[in-house]
């Protein structure tokens, strides 16, 4: 899928916002930790529920936790350690963009994901 429909920033933005959900998955790529990248032979992978990530930017910088939820519509992930209290006093997860995290541990229970890693592996 190519998002380069035009050189105009407004059209670039529009193509991201209007992308169908099955193509938005490509926006969820996150960097792997150096040890994990060396072990798997891949630099980036899409973030999934169950992965352990380290937050690199924002108020929760340095927090490590499991991914609880992935929101394809808003292009945000929710991590166990990143919570805040809302106006009702309830604890809610804070939305984080996938580009602002680094995957520390990958959930490899899915065979399809293992095939993706094999396909992407550097030769």
UniProtKB/Swiss-Prot annotation:
Q: Which NCBIfam families match?
A: rplX_A_E
Q: What does this protein do?
A: One of two assembly initiator proteins, it binds directly to the 5'-end of the 23S rRNA, where it nucleates assembly of the 50S subunit.
The similarity annotation says: Belongs to the universal ribosomal protein uL24 family.
Question: What's a single GO MF annotation on this record?
Answer: structural constituent of ribosome
Subunit note = Part of the 50S ribosomal subunit.
Matches recorded under SMART domains:
KOW (SM00739)
Name the UniProt record assigns to this protein? Large ribosomal subunit protein uL24
